[in-house]
Design a protein with these regions (language model features):
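Extracellular glycan-recognition regions
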Residues: 1-148
Length: 148
């Protein structure tokens, strides 16, 4: 499938795309609609999205974040050291590249911003997209297992 639209104006919407391999690359384009507030890529999620890592694109605060749920300490909306300010606007196509090498995660937003993180606790699960109080269109999704 070449395009997915996810979102709800009144809450949370998600799309699970299947098992995430321990060494892989996820590449896609995304357009955030005018009312979009938060877009997420979830990684190593359980079937209910109750335990997962999240790459977040916050259109209100203009930042890319990395988080896990449930959180270990404090109740910050993301891991404080894993926040990158980004230029992001609605109705513009952006490209994301996500590379996973076991516990190492590299995220590239629109070939301008990068973020590195570790995923030490949740070793396996699914991946997909989520949107809150808005709508996003995902296009040109490529998923590749990486071989050594």
């Amino acid at each position: 499938r070449s395009q997915w639209t996810i979102g709800r104006k009144d809450g949370f919407s998600s799309l699970d795309l299947g098992e995430l391999e321990s060494e892989c690359r996820i590449s896609f384009d995304v357009v955030f609609k005018e009312e979009s507030k938060n877009f997420y890529v979830f990684l190593n999620s359980d079937k209910d999205n109750e335990n997962a890592y999240y790459i977040g694109i916050d259109l209100v605060m203009k930042r890319m974040t990395f988080d896990r749920w449930p959180r270990k300490r404090n109740d910050y909306p993301f891991m404080l050291e894993l926040e990158r300010y980004i230029e992001v606007l609605p109705n513009v196509k952006y490209h994301l590249d996500i590379i996973r090498d076991n516990s190492v995660l590299e995220v590239y937003f629109d070939n301008k911003y990068a973020m590195s993180a570790r995923m030490n606790d949740f070793k396996e699960g699914t991946f997909g997209f989520a949107e809150t109080f808005g709508e996003a269109v995902i296009e040109s999704l490529e998923y590749m297992a990486l071989e050594r």
